[in-house]
A protein has these predicted regions:
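N-terminal cationic and glycine-rich segments that engage phosphates or anionic surfaces
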Residues: 1-105, 110-445
Length: 445
């Protein structure tokens, strides 16, 4: 505990890091406050039915968790950051097929800014479609007509659509500000803080269910909590696991007027088992909202079957498709975020090489092969943890709301984002000659 307090003191001593953390916390507070600001013209006291449906888990429960309860509150942030996530998925997928986007991806910082601008405009377009669907869907989700104080006419719909679109744009801006001026990935942090906000209520519901209904009592609650920490530990191991590729560097020495190369020190290239982080989970989850939403627009028997299959997040078909999407997106996102050819070129320029592998293209091919080999078990493990809530609901019979945190999207996002943020703080400490946050807080001599 003493070392931990000393580490916090060292964090506070670094002015830039301190300011970034304060800014990040301030922005997160603003986002959480906005999640409780109800849309004008809606009586918040009559949203009980909507709250009950989202508290019960299911697809609405996940959506509500991603928005930090804003969906159930009919707040100005009801759409959350998901339209931005959807836009990012579309832009990255289009980058495979559209030469213009491929060109932008290779232009460095200027290309990245242009891609971000395209993503923002696409986010607005998605919001314009989703906002009216959300407003008209409130009635179908159990919100009575009396809750709409201004009625459901255009005098309510048009201003509310503008507010919802503005809310998502503002949330997107908050996330980008955290990324640029704060600490951590802003968009991921907004999702994480929303998930954490609904965690206590889900646990309380599980606790009350076990105790009041004589359904296992405190002993079963204790076992569930212990197993929950085991799953968290497994998730941390997945996020942190790496394969070390040994690299040697040649150095020149002069002997009798002649220069010769000798082997220098051995170093390693760390290739992460899960190099794509939590993005495959977020992307896959965003896509899983689509089938049920589209099927809900039709009253045909086929559409109803699709809606039933993909509306049950603990069902067989939902989890099979979800796991498959996670595996696909893990490979896809790893290919984007791990430029093995660039790593090989950088290694060649610095005089490094992998024993038995020619520098340059062969090294790039070798690194790509290794990444493909380690990504497969990593993606399977990621998919297994993602569908774990469905498994524990079927076997253990825990509350669906609590099950969402028993592995699955929610837990993986919390663990992944927390570790990523801690690593950024860690780098600041190491750069200022302090031991990292992962170890101690002692000043280095």
């Amino acid at each position: 505990m003493k070392k931990f307090i000393e580490t916090l003191t060292n964090i506070w001593k670094i002015e830039e890091l301190r300011n970034r953390i304060i800014l990040t916390l301030g922005i997160l507070l603003v986002y959480r406050f906005g999640a409780h600001v109800v849309l004008p013209g809606i009586d918040s006291e009559q949203l009980t039915r909507l709250t009950d449906q989202t508290d019960g888990g299911g697809l609405l429960g996940i959506l509500n968790a991603f928005t930090g309860g804003a969906f159930a509150n009919a707040s100005v942030f009801a759409l959350g950051i998901m339209p931005y996530i959807s836009a990012s998925i579309v832009v990255q997928l289009m980058g495979i097929a559209i030469p213009y986007l491929q060109k932008l991806q290779k232009e460095g910082e200027s290309g990245r800014k242009r891609i971000n601008q395209i993503t923002r405009w696409l986010t607005i377009a998605i919001c314009i479609v989703q906002a009216p669907a959300y407003l008209y869907g409130l009635g179908a989700l159990g919100v009575p007509d009396s809750a709409f104080l201004l009625g459901k006419g255009l005098n309510f719909i048009i201003p509310s659509v503008l507010i919802l679109v503005t809310g998502t744009i503002f949330a997107m801006w908050l996330g980008e500000k955290i990324t640029d001026k704060g600490i951590g990935n802003g968009i991921s942090l907004l999702i994480m803080v929303g998930i954490i906000a609904v965690l206590p209520q889900s646990f309380i519901q599980e606790f009350v269910s076990r105790v009041s209904e004589n359904n296992g009592g405190l002993m079963l609650i204790l076992i569930e909590v212990i197993l929950w920490f085991v799953v968290i530990l497994a998730s941390i191991m997945l996020v942190m696991a790496t394969r070390q590729i040994p690299v040697q560097y040649a150095r020149r020495t002069a002997t009798g007027g002649f220069e010769k190369n000798v082997f220098g020190s051995r170093q390693y290239i760390p290739l992460k088992l899960n190099a794509s982080g939590v993005m495959p989970i977020i992307f896959a989850q965003a896509i899983m909202f689509v089938p049920a939403a589209v099927a809900g627009l039709s009253q045909s028997d086929t559409a109803k079957s699709i809606q039933a299959a993909f509306g049950d997040i603990f069902g067989l078909w939902y989890n099979l498709v979800f796991a498959l999407l996670i595996i696909v997106f893990t490979y896809f996102y790893t290919a984007i975020t791990v430029p093995t050819n660039k790593m090989a070129d950088d290694l060649k320029r610095s005089g490094g090489f992998i024993a038995g592998i020619r520098p340059g293209k062969e090294t790039g091919d070798y690194l790509d092969k290794i990444m493909s080999l380690i990504t497969f078990p990593g993606s399977l493990f990621l998919a297994l943890i993602a569908i774990l809530p469905a498994i524990v609901v079927k076997i253990v019979g825990i509350q669906q709301g609590w099950a969402l945190f028993y592995g699955g999207t929610s837990l993986l996002i919390m663990v992944g984002v927390a570790i990523d943020t801690m690593q950024q703080v860690n780098s600041y400490l190491l750069n200022r000659h302090y031991d990292g946050l992962m170890k101690t807080g002692k000043n280095r001599k």
